[in-house]
Amino acid sequence: MEKQCCSHPVICSLSTMYTFLLGAIFIALSSSRILLVKYSANEENKYDYLPTTANVCSELVKLVFCVLVSFCVIKKDHQSRNLKYASWKEFSNFMKWSIPAFLYFLDNLIVFYVLSYLQPAMAVIFSNFSIITTALLFRIVLKRRLNWIQWASLLILFLSIVALTAGTKTLQHNLAGHGFHHDAFFSPSNSCLLFRSECPRKDNCTAKEWTFPEAKWNTTARVFSHIRLGMGHVLIIVQCFISSMANIYNEKILKEGNQLAESIFIQNSKLYFFGILFNGLTLGLQRSNRDQIKNCGFFYGHNAFSVALIFVTAFQGLSVAFILKFLDNMFHVLMAQVTTVIITTVSVLVFDFRPSLEFFLEAPSVLLSIFIYNASKPQGPEYAPRQERIRDLSGNLWERSSGDGEELERLTKPKSDESDEDTF
Protein backbone atom coordinates (compact mmCIF):
# COMPACT_ATOMS: atom_id res chain seq x y z
CA MET A 1 0.00 0.00 0.00
CA GLU A 2 1.45 3.30 -1.04
CA LYS A 3 2.17 5.64 1.80
CA GLN A 4 0.72 9.10 1.60
CA CYS A 5 3.41 11.75 1.53
CA CYS A 6 1.42 14.47 3.16
CA SER A 7 -2.10 14.80 4.52
CA HIS A 8 -2.21 18.52 3.72
CA PRO A 9 -1.18 19.09 0.05
CA VAL A 10 -1.42 22.87 0.33
CA ILE A 11 0.86 22.95 3.36
CA CYS A 12 3.27 20.53 1.69
CA SER A 13 3.40 22.59 -1.50
CA LEU A 14 4.09 25.75 0.49
CA SER A 15 6.76 23.96 2.50
CA THR A 16 8.40 22.71 -0.69
CA MET A 17 8.23 26.17 -2.22
CA TYR A 18 9.83 27.75 0.86
CA THR A 19 12.53 25.08 0.85
CA PHE A 20 13.43 25.73 -2.79
CA LEU A 21 13.30 29.48 -2.20
CA LEU A 22 15.62 29.24 0.80
CA GLY A 23 17.99 27.02 -1.18
CA ALA A 24 18.02 29.44 -4.12
CA ILE A 25 18.72 32.40 -1.83
CA PHE A 26 21.58 30.53 -0.15
CA ILE A 27 23.11 29.56 -3.51
CA ALA A 28 22.92 33.12 -4.84
CA LEU A 29 24.42 34.63 -1.69
CA SER A 30 27.16 32.01 -1.34
CA SER A 31 28.22 32.39 -4.96
CA SER A 32 28.18 36.18 -4.69
CA ARG A 33 30.21 36.09 -1.50
CA ILE A 34 33.05 34.08 -3.04
CA LEU A 35 33.17 36.35 -6.08
CA LEU A 36 33.07 39.52 -3.98
CA VAL A 37 35.94 38.33 -1.77
CA LYS A 38 37.98 37.77 -4.93
CA TYR A 39 37.00 41.07 -6.53
CA SER A 40 37.65 43.07 -3.35
CA ALA A 41 41.34 42.11 -3.49
CA ASN A 42 43.85 44.20 -5.40
CA GLU A 43 45.81 43.17 -8.48
CA GLU A 44 48.32 41.30 -6.31
CA ASN A 45 45.60 39.17 -4.68
CA LYS A 46 46.05 41.03 -1.40
CA TYR A 47 43.55 43.08 0.58
CA ASP A 48 44.05 46.81 1.05
CA TYR A 49 41.50 46.73 3.85
CA LEU A 50 41.50 44.68 7.03
CA PRO A 51 39.29 41.62 6.35
CA THR A 52 38.35 41.55 10.02
CA THR A 53 36.67 44.95 9.60
CA ALA A 54 34.43 43.47 6.90
CA ASN A 55 33.55 40.55 9.16
CA VAL A 56 32.78 42.68 12.20
CA CYS A 57 30.55 44.93 10.09
CA SER A 58 28.63 41.96 8.69
CA GLU A 59 28.16 40.62 12.23
CA LEU A 60 26.89 44.04 13.29
CA VAL A 61 24.39 44.11 10.41
CA LYS A 62 23.09 40.68 11.41
CA LEU A 63 22.90 41.61 15.09
CA VAL A 64 20.99 44.84 14.48
CA PHE A 65 18.53 43.07 12.17
CA CYS A 66 17.93 40.17 14.59
CA VAL A 67 17.62 42.44 17.65
CA LEU A 68 14.99 44.58 15.93
CA VAL A 69 12.99 41.54 14.86
CA SER A 70 13.46 39.98 18.32
CA PHE A 71 11.94 43.01 20.00
CA CYS A 72 8.92 42.72 17.71
CA VAL A 73 8.59 39.00 18.54
CA ILE A 74 8.95 39.60 22.28
CA LYS A 75 6.44 42.44 22.22
CA LYS A 76 3.96 40.38 20.25
CA ASP A 77 4.27 37.17 22.30
CA HIS A 78 5.01 38.83 25.65
CA GLN A 79 8.18 36.77 26.04
CA SER A 80 10.19 39.28 28.05
CA ARG A 81 11.65 36.39 30.04
CA ASN A 82 13.79 35.53 27.02
CA LEU A 83 15.98 38.54 27.72
CA LYS A 84 16.62 37.67 31.37
CA TYR A 85 19.53 35.59 32.55
CA ALA A 86 18.70 35.33 36.24
CA SER A 87 20.13 31.88 36.89
CA TRP A 88 23.46 30.22 36.24
CA LYS A 89 21.71 27.68 34.03
CA GLU A 90 20.34 30.39 31.77
CA PHE A 91 23.72 32.11 31.74
CA SER A 92 25.46 28.86 30.76
CA ASN A 93 22.90 28.36 27.98
CA PHE A 94 23.73 31.85 26.78
CA MET A 95 27.47 31.12 26.87
CA LYS A 96 26.95 28.04 24.68
CA TRP A 97 26.56 30.37 21.73
CA SER A 98 30.17 31.52 22.11
CA ILE A 99 31.41 28.18 20.75
CA PRO A 100 29.79 28.31 17.28
CA ALA A 101 30.45 32.07 17.20
CA PHE A 102 34.18 31.47 17.65
CA LEU A 103 34.18 28.73 15.00
CA TYR A 104 32.31 30.94 12.53
CA PHE A 105 34.76 33.76 13.33
CA LEU A 106 37.65 31.51 12.27
CA ASP A 107 35.75 30.22 9.24
CA ASN A 108 34.93 33.70 7.94
CA LEU A 109 38.54 34.80 8.41
CA ILE A 110 40.14 31.79 6.72
CA VAL A 111 38.12 32.29 3.52
CA PHE A 112 40.14 35.44 2.78
CA TYR A 113 43.37 33.46 3.06
CA VAL A 114 42.04 30.63 0.91
CA LEU A 115 41.07 32.89 -1.98
CA SER A 116 44.51 34.52 -1.82
CA TYR A 117 46.03 31.17 -2.75
CA LEU A 118 43.41 29.38 -4.82
CA GLN A 119 41.26 30.16 -7.81
CA PRO A 120 37.57 30.44 -6.81
CA ALA A 121 36.79 27.31 -8.85
CA MET A 122 39.46 25.26 -7.09
CA ALA A 123 38.41 26.64 -3.70
CA VAL A 124 34.80 25.48 -4.09
CA ILE A 125 35.88 22.09 -5.50
CA PHE A 126 38.18 21.46 -2.55
CA SER A 127 35.51 22.71 -0.13
CA ASN A 128 33.60 19.52 -0.94
CA PHE A 129 35.94 17.96 1.60
CA SER A 130 33.38 19.30 4.10
CA ILE A 131 31.17 16.35 3.09
CA ILE A 132 33.77 14.05 4.65
CA THR A 133 34.31 16.16 7.74
CA THR A 134 30.56 16.55 8.28
CA ALA A 135 30.00 12.80 7.94
CA LEU A 136 32.83 12.02 10.37
CA LEU A 137 31.53 14.50 12.91
CA PHE A 138 27.99 13.15 12.50
CA ARG A 139 29.33 9.69 13.33
CA ILE A 140 31.58 10.76 16.21
CA VAL A 141 29.56 13.58 17.79
CA LEU A 142 25.95 12.74 16.95
CA LYS A 143 26.44 8.94 16.76
CA ARG A 144 24.86 8.82 13.31
CA ARG A 145 25.39 5.62 11.32
CA LEU A 146 26.44 5.39 7.68
CA ASN A 147 26.00 2.34 5.46
CA TRP A 148 28.89 0.84 3.51
CA ILE A 149 27.83 2.54 0.25
CA GLN A 150 28.07 5.94 1.90
CA TRP A 151 31.49 5.15 3.35
CA ALA A 152 32.61 3.99 -0.10
CA SER A 153 31.34 7.20 -1.70
CA LEU A 154 33.24 9.23 0.91
CA LEU A 155 36.41 7.30 0.06
CA ILE A 156 35.87 8.02 -3.65
CA LEU A 157 35.30 11.68 -2.81
CA PHE A 158 38.54 11.84 -0.80
CA LEU A 159 40.58 10.15 -3.55
CA SER A 160 39.03 12.41 -6.20
CA ILE A 161 40.02 15.52 -4.26
CA VAL A 162 43.56 14.17 -3.77
CA ALA A 163 43.82 13.42 -7.51
CA LEU A 164 42.49 16.88 -8.29
CA THR A 165 45.15 18.36 -6.02
CA ALA A 166 47.88 16.38 -7.77
CA GLY A 167 46.83 17.73 -11.15
CA THR A 168 46.60 21.43 -10.37
CA LYS A 169 48.99 24.29 -9.83
CA THR A 170 47.41 26.67 -7.40
CA LEU A 171 50.24 28.64 -5.84
CA GLN A 172 49.66 32.32 -5.37
CA HIS A 173 51.94 33.51 -8.15
CA ASN A 174 49.94 31.46 -10.68
CA LEU A 175 46.62 33.09 -9.83
CA ALA A 176 45.03 35.28 -12.46
CA GLY A 177 44.04 38.70 -11.25
CA HIS A 178 40.66 40.16 -11.97
CA GLY A 179 42.22 43.23 -13.59
CA PHE A 180 40.24 45.85 -11.69
CA HIS A 181 41.72 48.89 -10.04
CA HIS A 182 39.77 49.91 -6.95
CA ASP A 183 38.97 53.49 -6.07
CA ALA A 184 39.08 53.94 -2.32
CA PHE A 185 36.01 55.45 -0.68
CA PHE A 186 38.11 57.62 1.63
CA SER A 187 41.23 59.59 0.77
CA PRO A 188 44.09 58.64 3.10
CA SER A 189 45.24 61.30 5.53
CA ASN A 190 48.82 62.50 5.86
CA SER A 191 49.34 60.32 8.93
CA CYS A 192 48.04 57.33 6.99
CA LEU A 193 50.37 57.98 4.06
CA LEU A 194 53.28 58.29 6.48
CA PHE A 195 52.26 55.06 8.22
CA ARG A 196 52.00 53.16 4.92
CA SER A 197 55.37 54.45 3.74
CA GLU A 198 57.15 53.52 6.97
CA CYS A 199 55.57 50.13 7.58
CA PRO A 200 57.86 48.20 5.17
CA ARG A 201 60.91 49.44 7.09
CA LYS A 202 59.30 48.64 10.44
CA ASP A 203 58.21 45.21 9.18
CA ASN A 204 54.64 45.63 10.44
CA CYS A 205 52.66 46.02 7.24
CA THR A 206 49.16 44.64 7.40
CA ALA A 207 49.35 43.29 3.85
CA LYS A 208 52.25 41.08 4.82
CA GLU A 209 50.17 39.36 7.47
CA TRP A 210 47.75 38.09 4.87
CA THR A 211 50.39 35.94 3.14
CA PHE A 212 52.17 32.80 4.27
CA PRO A 213 55.61 31.60 3.20
CA GLU A 214 55.42 29.10 0.39
CA ALA A 215 55.05 25.59 1.74
CA LYS A 216 57.88 23.19 0.86
CA TRP A 217 56.78 20.04 2.62
CA ASN A 218 56.91 17.90 -0.52
CA THR A 219 60.64 18.41 -1.06
CA THR A 220 61.41 15.86 1.67
CA ALA A 221 58.61 13.42 0.87
CA ARG A 222 59.50 11.98 -2.51
CA VAL A 223 56.60 9.55 -2.47
CA PHE A 224 54.12 12.44 -2.45
CA SER A 225 56.19 14.85 -4.54
CA HIS A 226 53.66 14.72 -7.37
CA ILE A 227 50.97 16.14 -5.07
CA ARG A 228 51.28 19.91 -5.18
CA LEU A 229 50.07 20.52 -1.65
CA GLY A 230 50.17 24.25 -1.00
CA MET A 231 49.13 26.47 1.86
CA GLY A 232 45.77 27.05 0.18
CA HIS A 233 44.98 23.33 0.31
CA VAL A 234 45.92 23.08 3.99
CA LEU A 235 43.84 26.13 4.85
CA ILE A 236 40.75 24.86 3.08
CA ILE A 237 41.00 21.47 4.84
CA VAL A 238 41.20 23.31 8.16
CA GLN A 239 38.26 25.48 7.08
CA CYS A 240 36.19 22.38 6.23
CA PHE A 241 36.70 20.96 9.72
CA ILE A 242 35.94 24.29 11.38
CA SER A 243 32.82 25.02 9.32
CA SER A 244 31.50 21.47 9.84
CA MET A 245 31.98 21.70 13.59
CA ALA A 246 30.36 25.14 13.64
CA ASN A 247 27.31 24.04 11.65
CA ILE A 248 26.79 20.80 13.58
CA TYR A 249 27.10 22.45 16.97
CA ASN A 250 24.94 25.37 15.87
CA GLU A 251 22.21 23.04 14.60
CA LYS A 252 22.38 21.09 17.85
CA ILE A 253 21.81 24.06 20.14
CA LEU A 254 19.27 25.62 17.77
CA LYS A 255 17.03 22.59 18.24
CA GLU A 256 17.87 20.96 21.55
CA GLY A 257 15.32 20.99 24.36
CA ASN A 258 13.39 24.21 24.82
CA GLN A 259 15.59 25.98 22.26
CA LEU A 260 13.33 24.56 19.57
CA ALA A 261 10.49 26.83 20.68
CA GLU A 262 12.66 29.95 20.93
CA SER A 263 12.59 32.46 18.08
CA ILE A 264 15.45 32.05 15.63
CA PHE A 265 16.06 35.80 15.77
CA ILE A 266 16.55 35.73 19.55
CA GLN A 267 18.93 32.79 19.17
CA ASN A 268 20.88 34.50 16.41
CA SER A 269 21.15 37.69 18.46
CA LYS A 270 23.17 35.72 21.02
CA LEU A 271 25.33 34.16 18.31
CA TYR A 272 26.11 37.45 16.57
CA PHE A 273 26.86 39.19 19.86
CA PHE A 274 29.76 36.81 20.37
CA GLY A 275 30.69 37.16 16.70
CA ILE A 276 31.19 40.90 17.15
CA LEU A 277 33.10 40.25 20.38
CA PHE A 278 35.64 37.89 18.80
CA ASN A 279 36.17 40.04 15.70
CA GLY A 280 36.46 43.16 17.85
CA LEU A 281 39.06 41.51 20.09
CA THR A 282 41.10 40.60 17.02
CA LEU A 283 41.12 44.21 15.87
CA GLY A 284 41.94 45.52 19.33
CA LEU A 285 44.56 43.04 20.50
CA GLN A 286 46.64 42.79 17.32
CA ARG A 287 49.10 45.67 17.20
CA SER A 288 49.27 46.02 13.42
CA ASN A 289 45.47 46.23 13.25
CA ARG A 290 45.38 48.89 15.95
CA ASP A 291 48.09 50.94 14.25
CA GLN A 292 46.37 50.88 10.86
CA ILE A 293 42.98 51.80 12.32
CA LYS A 294 44.56 54.55 14.40
CA ASN A 295 46.46 56.11 11.48
CA CYS A 296 44.24 55.31 8.50
CA GLY A 297 40.76 54.77 9.93
CA PHE A 298 38.45 51.80 10.28
CA PHE A 299 37.34 51.73 6.63
CA TYR A 300 40.73 52.34 5.01
CA GLY A 301 41.15 50.33 1.81
CA HIS A 302 37.49 49.42 1.46
CA ASN A 303 35.93 49.58 -2.00
CA ALA A 304 32.54 48.97 -3.56
CA PHE A 305 33.10 45.20 -3.63
CA SER A 306 34.11 44.99 0.04
CA VAL A 307 31.09 47.05 1.10
CA ALA A 308 28.80 44.78 -0.93
CA LEU A 309 30.61 41.83 0.65
CA ILE A 310 29.60 43.04 4.13
CA PHE A 311 25.89 42.86 3.35
CA VAL A 312 26.10 39.68 1.27
CA THR A 313 28.00 37.92 4.08
CA ALA A 314 25.40 39.12 6.58
CA PHE A 315 22.41 37.79 4.66
CA GLN A 316 24.24 34.61 3.72
CA GLY A 317 24.81 33.98 7.42
CA LEU A 318 21.11 34.51 8.09
CA SER A 319 20.18 32.05 5.34
CA VAL A 320 22.49 29.42 6.88
CA ALA A 321 20.80 29.95 10.25
CA PHE A 322 17.36 29.36 8.71
CA ILE A 323 18.61 26.20 6.98
CA LEU A 324 20.07 24.79 10.20
CA LYS A 325 16.96 25.72 12.20
CA PHE A 326 14.24 24.46 9.87
CA LEU A 327 16.10 21.97 7.64
CA ASP A 328 19.47 20.35 8.36
CA ASN A 329 23.19 20.29 7.70
CA MET A 330 22.97 17.91 4.75
CA PHE A 331 20.62 20.25 2.89
CA HIS A 332 23.18 23.00 3.50
CA VAL A 333 25.99 20.84 2.10
CA LEU A 334 23.95 19.80 -0.93
CA MET A 335 23.14 23.39 -1.84
CA ALA A 336 26.86 24.14 -1.70
CA GLN A 337 27.37 21.71 -4.59
CA VAL A 338 25.27 23.93 -6.86
CA THR A 339 27.56 26.79 -5.84
CA THR A 340 30.49 24.67 -7.04
CA VAL A 341 29.06 24.48 -10.56
CA ILE A 342 28.27 28.21 -10.67
CA ILE A 343 31.68 29.35 -9.40
CA THR A 344 33.53 26.99 -11.74
CA THR A 345 31.63 28.38 -14.72
CA VAL A 346 32.25 31.98 -13.68
CA SER A 347 35.95 31.27 -13.10
CA VAL A 348 36.34 29.98 -16.65
CA LEU A 349 34.57 33.03 -18.09
CA VAL A 350 35.93 35.79 -15.84
CA PHE A 351 39.07 34.74 -13.96
CA ASP A 352 40.93 33.18 -16.90
CA PHE A 353 40.70 29.77 -15.28
CA ARG A 354 41.99 27.13 -17.71
CA PRO A 355 40.98 23.68 -16.47
CA SER A 356 43.07 20.79 -17.73
CA LEU A 357 41.81 17.49 -19.10
CA GLU A 358 42.42 15.94 -15.68
CA PHE A 359 40.12 18.54 -14.14
CA PHE A 360 37.26 17.64 -16.50
CA LEU A 361 37.77 13.95 -15.69
CA GLU A 362 38.16 14.28 -11.92
CA ALA A 363 35.75 17.10 -11.00
CA PRO A 364 32.66 15.09 -12.10
CA SER A 365 33.87 12.26 -9.84
CA VAL A 366 33.57 14.63 -6.89
CA LEU A 367 29.97 15.51 -7.74
CA LEU A 368 29.12 11.88 -8.58
CA SER A 369 30.40 10.62 -5.23
CA ILE A 370 28.29 13.26 -3.48
CA PHE A 371 25.23 12.11 -5.43
CA ILE A 372 25.88 8.46 -4.48
CA TYR A 373 26.31 9.44 -0.83
CA ASN A 374 22.93 11.16 -0.69
CA ALA A 375 21.11 8.64 -2.91
CA SER A 376 22.06 5.75 -0.63
CA LYS A 377 20.64 6.91 2.68
CA PRO A 378 20.18 4.03 5.15
CA GLN A 379 16.71 2.45 5.11
CA GLY A 380 17.07 -0.34 7.69
CA PRO A 381 15.38 -0.22 11.11
CA GLU A 382 18.73 0.20 12.85
CA TYR A 383 19.19 3.45 10.92
CA ALA A 384 15.66 4.72 11.48
CA PRO A 385 15.46 8.26 12.80
CA ARG A 386 14.49 8.75 16.41
CA GLN A 387 11.05 10.29 16.80
CA GLU A 388 10.11 12.54 19.66
CA ARG A 389 7.37 15.04 20.29
CA ILE A 390 7.65 18.19 22.34
CA ARG A 391 5.51 21.19 23.07
CA ASP A 392 6.70 24.74 22.60
CA LEU A 393 5.90 27.66 24.87
CA SER A 394 2.68 28.35 22.96
CA GLY A 395 1.36 24.83 23.51
CA ASN A 396 1.84 23.71 19.89
CA LEU A 397 2.98 20.12 19.39
CA TRP A 398 6.10 19.50 17.29
CA GLU A 399 7.52 16.26 15.98
CA ARG A 400 11.27 15.98 15.85
CA SER A 401 13.15 13.27 13.95
CA SER A 402 16.91 12.91 14.17
CA GLY A 403 18.57 11.53 11.06
CA ASP A 404 20.89 13.35 8.68
CA GLY A 405 19.85 16.44 10.51
CA GLU A 406 16.72 17.53 12.25
CA GLU A 407 13.39 17.54 10.40
CA LEU A 408 10.66 19.48 12.17
CA GLU A 409 6.97 19.27 11.53
CA ARG A 410 4.13 20.90 13.44
CA LEU A 411 1.35 18.53 14.36
CA THR A 412 -2.25 19.65 14.53
CA LYS A 413 -3.88 18.75 17.82
CA PRO A 414 -6.95 16.94 16.42
CA LYS A 415 -4.80 14.84 14.05
CA SER A 416 -1.86 13.98 16.24
CA ASP A 417 -2.48 10.24 15.96
CA GLU A 418 -0.45 7.33 14.66
CA SER A 419 -0.77 8.43 11.05
CA ASP A 420 1.29 11.50 11.81
CA GLU A 421 4.33 9.35 12.40
CA ASP A 422 4.31 8.32 8.76
CA THR A 423 4.63 11.90 7.61
CA PHE A 424 7.98 12.71 6.05
Swiss-Prot record:
Glycosylation sites: 204
Signal peptide: none
Membrane topology according to the record: Multi-pass membrane protein
Modification Phosphoserine occurs at: 394, 416, 419
Ranges facing Cytoplasmic side: 1-8, 75-93, 143-147, 250-263, 325-330, 376-424
Quaternary structure annotation from Swiss-Prot or TrEMBL: Probably forms homooligomers and heterooligomers with SLC35A1, SLC35A2, SLC35A3 and SLC35A4.
Subcellular location: Golgi apparatus membrane
Protein name per the record: UDP-sugar transporter protein SLC35A5
Main location: Golgi
CC per GO annotation: Golgi membrane
Catalytic activity line of the entry: UMP(out) + UDP-alpha-D-glucuronate(in) = UMP(in) + UDP-alpha-D-glucuronate(out); UMP(out) + UDP-N-acetyl-alpha-D-glucosamine(in) = UMP(in) + UDP-N-acetyl-alpha-D-glucosamine(out); UDP-N-acetyl-alpha-D-galactosamine(in) + UMP(out) = UDP-N-acetyl-alpha-D-galactosamine(out) + UMP(in)
Keywords, in A-Z order: Antiport, Glycoprotein, Golgi apparatus, Membrane, Phosphoprotein, Sugar transport, Transmembrane, Transmembrane helix, Transport
GO molecular function annotation: antiporter activity; pyrimidine nucleotide-sugar transmembrane transporter activity
UniProt topological domain (Lumenal) ranges: 30-53, 117-119, 169-228, 285-303, 352-354
Transmembrane segments: 9-29, 54-74, 94-116, 120-142, 148-168, 229-249, 264-284, 304-324, 331-351, 355-375
Biased composition (Basic and acidic residues): 408-417
